[in-house]
């Protein structure tokens, strides 16, 4: 079964973007390459169980086992030593990526309190979009009763677009609710 969002991309977004930016070929149309979810767990330095719980929640949200990230450098101010596990990340591609994006846009983001759309300033100049989520409770897979601590996560949507404008149009076409 093809994903709803992927069908929408092929049938609606590609023709609309081709018309707007005059691409010579369908392959030139920007597409979503991957989505990276990152959860930095700063208090994992003192308590390793926190990282396990964060990784388990990230696995529930993404449907994929997260990679444990380790500190690159030692920072005395943060009581951090090189090689200590301090976070978890997941890279989603293909079907899972479209499923996650669909779920994020249609279910999770509307559950954010006082939500007025995602900021339009979070593009990096290369066509990628970064979004910070303050609490993991907006995702339907997370059971409210099982949560010991509210954790946020970063969501980076990497596209093949060359400019922010192309990327914005692509994400808008896929249903991303940008703030007016």
UniProtKB/Swiss-Prot annotation:
Top-level taxon: Bacteria
Pfam families: Ribosomal_L5, Ribosomal_L5_C
Function, in words: This is one of the proteins that bind and probably mediate the attachment of the 5S RNA into the large ribosomal subunit, where it forms part of the central protuberance. In the 70S ribosome it contacts protein S13 of the 30S subunit (bridge B1b), connecting the 2 subunits; this bridge is implicated in subunit movement. Contacts the P site tRNA; the 5S rRNA and some of its associated proteins might help stabilize positioning of ribosome-bound tRNAs.
NCBIfam families tied to this protein: PRK00010.1
One GO term describing the cellular component: ribonucleoprotein complex
InterPro entries: Ribosomal_uL5, Ribosomal_uL5_bac-type, Ribosomal_uL5_C, Ribosomal_uL5_CS, Ribosomal_uL5_dom_sf, Ribosomal_uL5_N
HAMAP family: Ribosomal_uL5_B (MF_01333_B)
Family affiliation: Belongs to the universal ribosomal protein uL5 family.
GO terms (BP aspect): translation
Subunit structure, interactors included: Part of the 50S ribosomal subunit; part of the 5S rRNA/L5/L18/L25 subcomplex. Contacts the 5S rRNA and the P site tRNA. Forms a bridge to the 30S subunit in the 70S ribosome.
UniProt keywords, alphabetically: Ribonucleoprotein, Ribosomal protein, RNA-binding, rRNA-binding, tRNA-binding
Name used for this protein in its record: Large ribosomal subunit protein uL5
Species this chain originates from: Streptococcus agalactiae serotype V (strain ATCC BAA-611 / 2603 V/R)
Position of the signal peptide: none
Upper taxonomic lineage: Bacteria, Bacillati, Bacillota, Bacilli, Lactobacillales
GO MF, one example: structural constituent of ribosome
């Amino acid at each position: 079964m093809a994903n709803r969002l992927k069908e929408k991309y092929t049938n609606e977004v590609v023709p609309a973007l081709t018309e707007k930016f005059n691409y010579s070929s369908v392959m030139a149309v920007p597409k979503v390459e991957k989505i990276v979810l990152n959860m930095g767990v700063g208090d994992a330095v003192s308590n390793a169980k926190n990282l396990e719980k964060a990784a388990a929640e990230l696995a529930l949200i993404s449907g994929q086992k997260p990679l444990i990230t380790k500190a690159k450098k030692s920072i005395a101010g943060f009581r951090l030593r090189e090689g200590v596990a301090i976070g978890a990340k997941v890279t989603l591609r293909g079907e899972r990526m479209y499923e996650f994006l669909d779920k994020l846009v249609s279910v999770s983001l509307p559950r954010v309190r006082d939500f007025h759309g995602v900021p339009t300033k979070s593009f990096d100049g290369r066509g990628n979009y970064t979004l910070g989520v303050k609490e993991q409770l907006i995702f339907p897979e997370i059971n409210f009763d099982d949560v010991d601590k509210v954790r946020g996560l970063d969501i980076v949507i990497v596209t093949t677009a060359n400019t922010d404008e192309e990327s914005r149009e692509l994400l808008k076409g896929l249903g991303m609710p940008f703030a007016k």
